[in-house]
A protein has these predicted regions:
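Transmembrane-helix boundary motif in ABC transporter permease subunits
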Residues: 26-57, 69-74, 125-130
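Membrane-embedded alpha-helices of multi-pass transport/permease systems
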Residues: 33-36, 178, 182-196, 200
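Transmembrane alpha-helices
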Residues: 197, 216-240
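An internal, D/E-rich "acidic patch" concept
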Residues: 1-35
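Hydrophobic alpha-helical segments of membrane proteins
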Residues: 24-28, 32, 67, 71, ...
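Membrane-water interface segments at transmembrane-helix boundaries in multipass membrane proteins
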Residues: 56-63, 67-183
Length: 240
């Protein structure tokens, strides 16, 4: 009877925006980080860095999650006092707020989705460019424009009045997002490493090397792309 007279649907709807925000941030960051680390591990197989990163990934993948979360809370929240331990905001800052926290969560979700879509289209637009320097420059320019657009978004119009509240929520999200990302990226990294090591044995990789293609191009355009399918499939099943 703690939440009476609210119905279960009302309670779920009340907490859904903050759940979706955390879910979106963790999945985007962990998938990108895991895939990036995984392809580097496969490419540098046999090296000392590959050994240590693989051991770290296996530890993250097999660690007991409740214990690890408590250790993160103890170290970053209690011992170092860098990050807040409980709740998702400071109640005293929201006492006179003209809107509910869910409004800020919805705005932050929209912002993350828009920025992610823009970066995806920048990547798709530049991926077939032959010149590595041109590709890097265009992606860097796209990133700068995205950052400028984000700054304008949060400093103009209706979002300006909500910026401080969004920063409060974002500050409280650092620790949970980081903690879940550390344990979530490992599965993607290990799967990417395994599938890419199989791909590197294929004949077309040997052909690409014989044609004199750069190591980066062989890794990113030939090996990593073909290793991506099972990784994306696993990622989709994880979301579902």
């Amino acid at each position: 009877y703690k939440y009476f007279p609210k119905t279960p649907i009302e309670l779920i709807a009340e907490r859904l925006p903050r759940t979706l925000m955390l879910f979106a941030m963790v999945n985007i960051v962990s998938f990108y980080t895991g895939f990036l680390i995984g392809k580097i591990l496969a490419w540098r197989r046999g090296s000392k860095s590959e050994t240590w990163i693989t051991i770290t990934s296996v530890f993250s993948y097999t660690v007991f999650y409740p214990w690890f979360a408590l250790m993160m809370l103890w170290f970053f929240g209690y011992k170092m006092d860098w990050l807040p331990i409980g709740k998702f905001l400071y109640p005293e800052k929201w006492y006179d707020a003209p809107f509910d926290s869910d409004v800020i969560f919805v705005l932050m979700i929209k912002f993350v989705v828009i920025v992610s879509v823009i970066q995806f289209f920048i990547y798709m637009f530049t991926r077939n460019i032959e010149s590595l320097n041109t590709k890097r420059n265009l992606r860097f320019i796209g990133l700068i424009l995205n950052i400028i657009g984000s700054f304008i978004f949060w400093n103009t119009g209706d979002a300006l009045t909500k910026k401080l509240y969004a920063m409060d929520i974002a500050y409280h999200m650092i620790l949970p997002v980081f903690t879940v990302t550390v344990v979530a990226f490992a599965g993607t990294a290990l799967l990417t490493r395994t599938t890419m090591m199989e791909v590197l044995k294929d004949d077309y990789i040997l052909t690409a090397r014989a044609k004199g293609l750069s190591q980066r191009r062989i890794r990113d355009r030939h090996a990593a792309r073909n290793a991506l399918l099972p990784v994306v499939t696993s990622f989709i099943f994880t979301i579902v």
